[in-house]
Amino acid sequence: MPTIQQLIRSQRKKVEKKTKSPALRGCPQRRGVCTRVYTTTPKKPNSALRKVARVRLTSGFEVTAYIPGIGHNLQEHSVVLVRGGRVKDLPGVRYHIVRGILDTAGVKDRSQGRSKYGVKRPK
């Protein structure tokens, strides 16, 4: 506990909040170009082949982003929109690719939770 005299001499240090998505530089989303599209396995106790992509963002960062939903049309040089949001069982994956915008197609035959997967309302 500092004395009054110590507080007069120097103020209390402000606790700075550390961002969980530094590559976005404070923006809600960023555009990027896929440099590699591949699958990876989650950590224990889960088992799957998760679809991820290495993306070079306009902010200059190269990040690993998760491709949500069933099936995708992404390949190298695809232009994608990246948002924040980690994948709990994939270490180092702190971003998601937004479906249904730029080069990323929406999920086929999706009827529930459509807005999260870039699917228009079926006629």
Swiss-Prot record:
Location(s) in or outside the cell: Plastid, Chloroplast
UniProt KW keywords: Chloroplast, Plastid, Ribonucleoprotein, Ribosomal protein, RNA-binding, rRNA-binding
GO molecular function: rRNA binding; structural constituent of ribosome
Glycosyltransferase recorded as keyword: no
Coiled coil start-end: none
Leader peptide range in chain numbering: none
GO CC, alphabetical: chloroplast; small ribosomal subunit
Superkingdom assignment: Eukaryota
GO biological process: translation
Gene3D superfamilies for this protein: Nucleic acid-binding proteins (2.40.50.140)
Assembly and binders: Part of the 30S ribosomal subunit.
Family: Belongs to the universal ribosomal protein uS12 family.
Function: With S4 and S5 plays an important role in translational accuracy. Located at the interface of the 30S and 50S subunits.
Name of the featured protein: Small ribosomal subunit protein uS12c
